[in-house]
Amino acid sequence: MLKDILRKTTQSDLYRYENIVKKINDLERVMKPLTNEELRAKTLGFRKSIEDGQSIDNILPEAFGLVREASLRILGLRHYDVQLIGGCILHDSKIAEMKTGEGKTLVAILPAYLNALSGKSVHIVTVNEYLAKRDSLSVGRVLSFLGLSVGLILADMNREERQENYKCDVIYTTNSELGFDYLRDNLVGNPSEKVQNGFEFAIIDEVDSVLIDEARTPLIISRSLETLNNIYLTAKNVAQAFEINTHYEIDKRNRNVYLNESGSKLAEKLLGVSSIYKFETGTYILNAIKAKEFYTKDKDYLVMRNQITIVDEFTGRILKGRRWGDGLHQAIEAKEGVTVGSETMTMASITYQNFFLFYKKLSGMTGTALTEAKEFKKIYNLSVDCVPINKKVNRIDKEDVVYKSLYAKWKAVLYESLSIHEQGRPLLIGTSNVKNSEIVSGLLKEYNIKHSLLNAKPENAANESEIIAQAGRKGSVTIATNMAGRGTDILLGGNPDFLTKGELRYIFRSIVLSLDDMTVPKNELINNLKYKYVISEKNRLDVEELIDKLKSAYTVPEKNRIGVEELIENIDESFQPVDKFEILIQKLYEKTKERYVRECLAEKEEVIQLGGLHIIGTEKHDSRRIDNQLRGRAGRQGDPGSSKFFLSFEDRLIEIFTTGGLKNMIKELDLEDDQPVEGKIVSLSIESAQKRIEDKNYQVRKQLFNYDNVLNLQRKVIYDERDRFLSLTDFKGLILQYLEKLVDDVVAEMERSENQEDKSRGIVLFCKKFICLPYSIDPELLSNLSKEEIKIFLNDQVKISYELKEIELESLRVGLSQSLEYAFLLQSIDQVWKEQLTRMELLKESIGWRAYGQRDPLLEYQKEAYRIFAIQTRKIRHSASHLIMCSTSFA
């Protein structure tokens, strides 16, 4: 049903988009004769039209046509009709599903240009910094050529650099930088320290990775707390003494641990305590067991430089700076014997689900979105449209084969690899984690098969783009962990641009090394280069000239070295050299690339004849999307290719999630260990298991979204109030308002006491201790006053006291009262919000128990959250009032 609805919706929209594309194509003859200056002038004309009230939808055909022409002139790349359709989908605030190799990067600049014309910034969001930097320096030049400013936000930028880049028309950055900048902006002490300028339109590349896969992991800014590290080591020792099913049970599906009575008694005996729960030791022990049972080195994390580094299960990359919460990270540190880090207190947090909903307009691109169409619509109100492919997919996806044991599976993977390699076909082997990638690498080494290994380990990840770019060469073998967000196409025959830049870098670095020893003959260097790269005689003179030039020009080697490395990274046919040295580099680039283009085209034809790129999958992922991303690397742009998955009944997904019927069938067949099972029944059973996991994960994300929505409403109230503090120039009115509400709260609290004397004494104590009145009040004065009279009396006293406070502070230094009030207001709201985040986390963890009382946990959470928040907002007023009134003594 859902597929039919999606198909009909996509089809009706497709007719509309095709009509727009026809208009764009008709305008091409108008754009062609225009000079570069005339093309740029169009941008000013569009902006004027928008200022005069014209809708950007009306100028879409002409704007897209302009970008297409500029792209052809600057990059030598002309948008296909299907790419124009992709641009229309993005402009309509939808998700464009585009297959691998269909040019998503080029598509994004179409709606980015159009929407930036209105003067509001467009954020193009990528999953890693390499892609953000690459795209801003490549396709970003088209936008710059047309007169738009292009910004780039990277992790190592300071505040001033961020502020400058966020002012640009189009900004390339990562999802994590956007989220953390938002959180940091809401912790600043001065509005001038903020870096972001609002959320207008975001185009998210690999949108499924950001909005689906990372939805469960909140962005958190925290500060360290003092930690008793020995408690984690003690818990680890206790966990090691336990045996599974004797002292505890585990739930593999949900990664939960249950300590039974035997385990509790043993723990209490080992620790010498009466109850592990009474002393909160139970939580530490449960985490230690989770670390032992569910978290595996080189799969879930790496040990690097005495630290635990998390590996992203979806992309295979390390997550720098991320830590598991609730003491789990410390438990894993204790397990691995590295330094146990401090526990942290959350200062600010947000999920991507709620962060990206800030944008007035949101869209995204990916090769795999339809499987999650329901979630995109439900959570983000984003429809998914499939972009027609430019050329028919020519890939053969073979049936999955399943072996009884892991040993038999790896043996089959090896034999398949040897067979494909003997044919000369390029081979890409996908693995689910670092550990498995190294198993395959070890097997290939045994047979002396040269290969490239790409996983989360820094020594392997450093040359990621080059490894992927050359994975389509004849006879190449590449092992890679999950392929999501790799961002580089695999071109059959090799990528001439990467090969050219690789050769230039090698030449340059070799020359730099030779500068330390000026006696190294040029011929020896040239011969070394010939060994590494095929340096033609045509290039020989250029290389010799470059050696002489470098040896004479190096006055500040380190600075020049960095500059030349960046020059090589960014150079292309449209590069404009500014001196003789750059002219030489440009000349060398053009000649070298010309050679590689010829070689790669010739090699591509050979690889096509052999059958193209072959994909081997070594395990099915929980999500079908990740499997499809791996498959999608073969068969791009009409090229031939094939894929095949090799599985085992000992694989996690099959072992835990497939039905008993499949396992019983295998037992009845009584197969040999190396005899595989294949066919529709097996594939359907595995796919059914994946669908169940996907649905379960969707329910988890949906629940997280529902719970985080409650916190998000509170976050909005707090951040709006904080922004109000930042924008005020005079705090007197606000402080008096806070003091009046404080009096109301105190009087209401005292009214609960039935004893008049207790009421009077309580109010006097409040005046003395909480608001630090500089004089005493006689309780007898209050004994005969009504509630309203007490309020009037106290408000008068508080106001007089506040006025005296201001006079005293101003006498010490002009402006001191304003400075202190500003600081105390921010201190109060920040401290209370930190406490609230901790309270809400504890509430979320405990609220599930209410289900046993036949109550809806979410509804209970909403009620309790509202009650706690009401108390905390009062606490902001009380805390700020107390700090301001008691900042110095009147004595």
Curated annotation (Swiss-Prot):
Has a central role in coupling the hydrolysis of ATP to the transfer of proteins across the thylakoid membrane. ATP binds at Q83, G101, E102, G103, K104, T105, D489. InterPro entries: Helicase_ATP-bd, P-loop_NTPase, SecA, SecA_CS, SecA_DEAD, SecA_motor_DEAD, SecA_preprotein_X-link_dom, SecA_SF2_C. It comes from the Eukaryota. Belongs to the SecA family. This is Protein translocase subunit SecA. CDD domains: DEXDc_SecA, SF2_C_secA. It is found in: Plastid, Chloroplast stroma; Plastid, Chloroplast thylakoid membrane. Its EC number is 7.4.2.8. Keywords: ATP-binding, Chloroplast, Membrane, Nucleotide-binding, Plastid, Protein transport, Thylakoid, Translocase, Translocation, Transport. It catalyses: ATP + H2O + cellular proteinSide 1 = ADP + phosphate + cellular proteinSide 2. One of its GO terms (biological process) is protein targeting. One of its GO terms (molecular function) is protein-exporting ATPase activity. It is a peripheral membrane protein. GO terms for cellular component: chloroplast stroma; chloroplast thylakoid membrane.
